[in-house]
């Protein structure tokens, strides 16, 4: 029995259309809260044994074909507000990264690194997303979240365990808002910089394809800068190329010809196709270089039940 809600609670909701790769089976339940109070009350009343999975806009996610045995929580319009207060940019977890970058720039605040990062602020914080040498951790002050027990809390950035493409958020914790510190900048110059970033991205990445962004993390321990905190200069795409996996296919899944660290759904791919191709890339790269790539895309859920 699910607790009463003011938002939307749907049983057996197929998740494929909520992910950028357009794959995935059903969640036991999908909850879209009306606001933070609705989220707090729901989690406080939900059986503690029921797993909870916070889901952003599905930009960095493979949901397996068997679906998710959990309550998936997806934030919407009640969580996408953006406001500027001095040098602080406060964004709801459902606000798109690109929208936050543009709003900040219009106000003369520099969060331009967010402009070409796919997805929403909640996911960007959870993954410590970064681009052009800048990461969420470089700007984040604090987050607001609701714990699995239904308590609203403020968590300083220092307590989030932010590292390369990861964080240490408590299990079942749902981010609702993030506060960033942003340096001042000229709005016209910031807009020009973002246009350059977009042009660079569109010329080198398959932005018109169904993808989830970078598939694998750049390997740790290989630095060309000498900085102790910048040890990911060996690029995953280069290792994939050297292993002969650019353009490799499995079913409807393909490693992009345009950028070999992008896994794309060419049409009709299953989650098994996508994940299977990714695992084959990991195997082939290890055979070629002795380096084991790590997934950057999150993979969740169950394999489909074999009915034979």
Curated annotation (Swiss-Prot):
Pathway: Cell wall biogenesis; peptidoglycan biosynthesis. It is found in: Cytoplasm. GO terms for molecular function: FAD binding; UDP-N-acetylmuramate dehydrogenase activity. The keyword Cell wall biogenesis/degradation applies. The keyword Magnesium does not apply. GO terms for biological process: cell division; cell wall organization; peptidoglycan biosynthetic process; regulation of cell shape. Its cofactor is FAD. Residues 197-228 are annotated as: Disordered. Coiled coil: none annotated. Residues 197-211 have a biased composition (Basic and acidic residues). The active site is at 165, 214 (proton donor), 296. It comes from the Bacteria. HAMAP family: MurB (MF_00037). This is UDP-N-acetylenolpyruvoylglucosamine reductase.
């Amino acid at each position: 029995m699910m607790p009463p809600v003011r938002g939307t609670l749907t049983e057996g909701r197929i998740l494929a259309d909520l992910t950028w790769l357009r794959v995935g089976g059903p969640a036991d339940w999908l909850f879209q809260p009306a606001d933070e109070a609705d989220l707090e009350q729901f989690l406080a009343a939900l059986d503690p044994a029921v797993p909870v999975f916070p889901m952003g806009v599905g930009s960095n996610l493979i949901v397996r074909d068997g679906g998710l045995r959990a309550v998936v929580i997806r934030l919407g319009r009640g969580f996408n507000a953006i406001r500027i207060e001095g040098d602080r940019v406060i964004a709801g977890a459902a606000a798109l990264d690109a929208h936050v970058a543009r709003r900040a720039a219009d106000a003369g605040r520099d969060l331009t690194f967010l402009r070409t990062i796919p997805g929403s602020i909640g996911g960007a914080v959870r993954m410590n997303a970064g681009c052009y040498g800048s990461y969420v951790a470089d700007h984040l002050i604090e987050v607001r979240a609701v714990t699995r027990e239904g308590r609203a809390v403020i968590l300083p950035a220092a307590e989030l365990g932010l590292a390369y493409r990861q964080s240490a958020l408590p299990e079942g914790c749902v981010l609702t808002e993030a506060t960033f510190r942003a340096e001042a900048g000229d709005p016209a110059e910031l807009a020009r910089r973002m246009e350059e970033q977009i042009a660079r991205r569109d010329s080198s990445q398959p932005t018109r394809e169904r993808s989830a962004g970078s598939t694998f993390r750049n390997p740790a321990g290989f630095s060309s800068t000498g900085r102790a905190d910048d040890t990911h200069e060996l690029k995953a795409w280069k290792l994939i190329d050297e292993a002969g996996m650019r353009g490799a296919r499995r079913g409807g899944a393909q490693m992009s010809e345009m950028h070999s660290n992008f896994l794309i759904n060419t049409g009709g791919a299953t989650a098994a196709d996508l994940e299977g191709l990714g695992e084959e890339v990991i195997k082939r790269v290890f055979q070629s270089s002795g380096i084991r790539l790590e997934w950057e895309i999150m993979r969740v859920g169950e394999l489909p039940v074999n009915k034979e």
